[in-house]
Amino acid sequence: MDLFTQFGIPEPTPFSGALKVLVAESHNEIRLILSHHLTKLGFVVHRTERSGKVALAELLNDPAHITVAGDDLPGVAGLELLRELRENPKAQRGAFVLLTKALQKNEAMLAIEAGVDDFMVRPIALTDLMPKIRTAYANFVNPKSPERVYEFAKSKLRTDDLNGAKAVYEALSLSNPKAARPHVGLARVALVNNQVDAALKQVNFAVERNAMYVHAHALKAEILVKMNKVTEATEAFSTAIKISPLNIMRYEQCCEFLLKNKLINETISILEIGLTAGLQDPFIAERIGYCYFENKDYPKAQKYLRQALRTDPENMGFANSLAICCRDAGLLDESVEIYNTILKRENDNHPVLFNKALVLILQNKKDEAGKILKRCLKIAPEFEKAKAKLGEIGIS
C-alpha cells in the first residue's frame, strides 16, 4: 500500500487558471510583467513581492498553490525561500517555479534536490509561462513524489495531531531509510511533546545522514537552547549559518539567542560570516553596530550604524541608535542633529524627544530640555521617565 492510500491523503486541487499564485521577484518590471501575464491567463495573483522574507510571511499567512520566485531575492533568495517553505511546519508549500540564470548541470541537480518543481531561465519568455507552471504543478502533485506526504505530516503538526504526524514521519523513514528529513520531522514531534532528549537523538540521526542539512543544524540549535546548552547551541547555529550564509532569518534567530545570553563577541563573529558572504541586509550592519556599542567601541559602532542607515534611510530606529551612540561617544551636537532629523518625520515621537532632552541636559541647556520634557508629557501624560527627569533638573 502506498503512503497516499495508507494515510488517506486528499487528492490535490486540479490544475486550472483559478489556482492562486504568488510572484516573488526583486526586479520591479519583471515582477509586474509576470503578474500581469498570469492574471491574463486567468490565475489569481494574490501578492507580488520583491523580498523573499516578506514573501515567506505572506505565504505563511495565505498559502498559494504555486510560487514563482527569483533566485536573487534579497535576504532570502529563491532556493532559501523554498527550503523554508518545505521545512517550516507552519507553512503550506505548493508547486515552486524558480526564475534563474542558466544553470550548470550540478546547480540544476542541487535545485531539484531542494524541491524546485521547474525552472524559468532568464531572459524569460512569456510564452513559456503557462507550460512551466503546468509542469511544475504536475511535478508537485505527482503521487510518486513524497512532497505531499511531507506536507500532510506538517498539517498533522499544525493541528496538534502529534501521533498522526509521528506515524507519517515514521512511514517516510521506513520507505527511505537513508533519508534525513523524516528524522527532523520526528524531532519536531518530540520537541512539541517536550521530549528534548528524544528530539536531540532524532536530529542527530538527521545530521549523520546529511551533514549539509541546514535545517537539521538549525533545529539542533533550537533543541540545545531548550536544554540550556549555550556553547553547543552556538556551535549548531554557526554550522547552520556557514552552510547557508545568505539567509537573513538564520542570523536573526541566532543573534536573538546570543544577545540574550550576552555573547557579544560571538554575535559579531557570526554576523561577520554574512558580511564576508556578501549578504546585503541592514540587519547585519545594525546588529554589529549594536554589539560594538555594547563593547563601548564607539567609532566602530558608528561605522556600522551609519552603514545600516545608508541601506535603509527610512528606518528611524537605526537613526535613534546612531544618535544614542553619538551621545555616548561625546558627539553631542551630532546627536542632536540626528534627533532633529527624526523629529521632522515623527514630531510626536516622545521617546525620541526624551532622548534629545537627555543630550540637551548634557549640553547644559536645561531650559530647552525642560520644554521638550513637558512636550513629552503632553503627548504621553503617564511617561514616568519624563516626569522623573523634570524633577532631577528642578523644573516643575
What is each of the regions a protein language model found here?
Residues 17-30, 34-38, 67, 157, ...:
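Conserved acidic segment of CheY-like receiver
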Residues 80, 103-118:
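Alpha4 helix (beta4-alpha4-beta5 surface) of REC/receiver domains from two-component response regulators
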Residues 43-51, 58:
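Short hydrophobic/Thr-rich beta-strand motif most characteristic of the beta2 strand and flanking loop
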Residues 1-22, 26, 150-154, 389-396:
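Non-catalytic signal-transmission and effector/linker regions of two-component phosphorelay proteins
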Residues 52, 68-85, 92:
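Conserved phosphotransfer microenvironments
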